[in-house]
Structures are given as C-alpha cells and as structure tokens.
C-alpha cells in the first residue's frame, strides 16, 4: 500500500501537486529453499521485477514460494544427476561466474522471479470492460507470456539445453 498526499488548492504547489510516499519496506525474511537450490530474497525479487511495494509481502512470498516449488520440480532430474556427480548445491555445479555469481544460480533466481511475477500479474488483471481496459489486458497478457518464456529459457540454461526444440512435422 502507498500513502498519497494531495495538497489543498490554497497551498502553494509545485509541479503536479501530488506527492507519493511509498510505504516503508518492512522486514521480508529470506525464503529458505531445499538443500540444493539457493534461498530467495524477496527484496531482490521486488527490485528485479520492479514490484516495489505494489504487492503485499504475504502475496509476494506466496508467489515466490510457488515459483521456487515449480522451478525445483522442473529441475528435479537435473538435481538428481548433479547430486550423483557429487555436487551438493547448485552453486557448486561448474559454471561461469558473472559479477561473482554462478550463471546457474543467476538463471535459477531469474526463473523464480519470472514465474512469481507472471503468477502475480495473472491474478492482478483488472475487470475493466472498456476498450481501454481490453487494451491494457492484452498488454498484460503479452507481458505474462514473456515472463513464462523467460522462466522456460532460464530453466533450459541451467540444464545446458537449447532454449527451444524445433522439429519438423
């Protein structure tokens, strides 16, 4: 939630006359993951996906946990193979580092962020029946599709698979 302050007309106003004060960020504890995959910090998800304080912490936490569970399920066989090869964490699996972070961990967090955000957007669509509302819904649908695509691509990158499989019929 946000606080919106609208000054009275008689008060001197500069600019548009409204000041938006975002709700102070509360304490959002890191979400613990399984032993193999990294924990997820809700603050990083908010920053990466530009969610700021527009989503309640409880809703964001639920969406992230769902994203983690689904991504973990998608990577179950990959995880089993890597554990059999002697790796105890995703961060231990050989991969390039960018900015001091394993590419595999980066893509894992990207997959979770994309899925959590897609899930939130699907549930936050408006019920506006006007032409403007329809156009906005189409734009949101496109964004949701792109987020699901990003999730699939990130999961493929973790597994060193191509982003898409094309076959001739």
Short names for language-model regions:
Residues 52, 97-104, 139:
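Non-transmembrane, amphipathic alpha-helical segments
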Residues 35, 57, 102, 106-110:
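Amphipathic, non-membrane alpha-helical segments in soluble helical-bundle scaffolds
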Residues 91, 99, 144-146:
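A short linear-motif detector with a strong N-terminal bias
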Residues 104-169:
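Short loop/turn elements at secondary-structure junctions
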Residues 2-93, 97, 153-169:
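Conserved short "hinge" loops at termini or chain/domain junctions
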């Amino acid at each position: 939630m946000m606080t919106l302050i609208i000054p009275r007309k008689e008060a001197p106003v500069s600019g548009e006359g409204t000041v938006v004060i975002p709700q102070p960020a509360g304490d959002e504890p890191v979400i613990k993951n399984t032993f193999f995959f990294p924990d997820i910090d809700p603050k990083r998800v908010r920053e990466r996906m530009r969610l700021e304080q527009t989503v309640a912490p409880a809703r964001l936490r639920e969406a992230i946990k769902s994203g983690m569970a689904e991504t973990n399920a998608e990577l179950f066989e990959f995880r089993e193979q890597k554990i059999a090869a002697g790796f105890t964490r995703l961060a231990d699996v050989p991969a390039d580092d960018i900015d001091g972070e394993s590419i595999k961990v980066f893509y894992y967090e990207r997959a979770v962020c994309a899925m959590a955000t897609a899930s939130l957007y699907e549930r936050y669509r408006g019920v506006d029946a006007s032409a403007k509302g329809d156009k906005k819904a189409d734009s949101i649908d496109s964004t949701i599709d792109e987020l699901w695509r990003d999730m699939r691509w990130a999961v493929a990158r973790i597994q060193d698979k191509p982003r898409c499989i094309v076959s001739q019929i």
